[in-house]
Amino acid sequence: MSAVESGSKVLRMKESDAQKLLAMRCHIGTRNQSSAMKKYIYGRTAEGSHIIDVHMMWEKLILAARVIAAVENPKDVCVCSSRLYGTRAIYKFSQHVGTSFHGGRFIPGTFTNQIQKKFVQPRVLVVTDPRTDHQAIREASLVNIPVIALCDTDAPLEYVDIAIPCNNRGIKSIGMMYWLLAREVLRLRGTIVRSVPWEEKVDLFFYRDPNEAAEEKAAAAAAAPAAEAEEGFGWVERNDDNAWEA
């Protein structure tokens, strides 16, 4: 029995949360596996992709949330994502939880070079992918910063203290994991209550291509005049039986 299952019933995974994880394919890993991630794998799909144990995923997510909630100053928690698909998710996570964040390329020396302008000394580091965020993890190991990481089935766990097994390559999967992590941190802090669903939509944690969003906005703007003209166009019947006018 896991620590979460044997502990408080409040922390146990609800059916609705399990459905969210499955719907966003958080449990579908890669076709490869690392020896360190083997214990988190439940099976394989017909296509050969590894299936991650959802219960172990939830257990590690709750553990990570408890660590983050225990940090007195939220700004002492740094969330990083060199992976493009995770930048929106870490921004929204930081907005709600109050942590600091670094999106895009991680500048070497951010944790180790004190003369650098963006030098910071966080107490906890959260990363989206141990592979793409390897520079941040390596620097954290040099200055004894605990690392929490979203780890796929092929992820290396060197210098990772808390590995949350999940699909860290899908846009919706990354967004869902950070949404759940933010919700659990806020619940542990007492900011929101468990009896009421969190009003924040998970869609806001999903990455959107700026070019795609601009194209949709332009298409909507172009369609607006046509729709207005169509609404203003009608037929008025005249007194004669066979005559109509616009």
From Swiss-Prot:
Assembly, per entry: Component of the small ribosomal subunit. Mature ribosomes consist of a small (40S) and a large (60S) subunit. The 40S subunit contains about 33 different proteins and 1 molecule of RNA (18S). The 60S subunit contains about 49 different proteins and 3 molecules of RNA (25S, 5.8S and 5S). Interacts with ribosomal protein S21.
Cell location: Cytoplasm
GO biological-process terms attached to the record: cytoplasmic translation; ribosomal small subunit assembly
GO CC annotation terms, alphabetical: cytoplasm; cytosolic small ribosomal subunit
Main location: cytoplasm
InterPro entries in the record: Ribosomal_uS2, Ribosomal_uS2_CS, Ribosomal_uS2_euk, Ribosomal_uS2_euk/arc, Ribosomal_uS2_flav_dom_sf
Family from the record: Belongs to the universal ribosomal protein uS2 family.
Domain of life of the organism encoding this protein: Eukaryota
Lineage: Eukaryota, Discoba, Euglenozoa, Kinetoplastea, Metakinetoplastina
Stored NCBIfam families: uS2_euk_arch
Residue ranges of coiled coil: none
Key word Cytoplasm present: yes
Function: Required for the assembly and/or stability of the 40S ribosomal subunit. Required for the processing of the 20S rRNA-precursor to mature 18S rRNA in a late step of the maturation of 40S ribosomal subunits.
Protein name from the UniProt record: Small ribosomal subunit protein uS2
GO MF annotation: an example: structural constituent of ribosome
Record-annotated membrane-spanning stretches: none
Keyword annotations: Cytoplasm, Ribonucleoprotein, Ribosomal protein
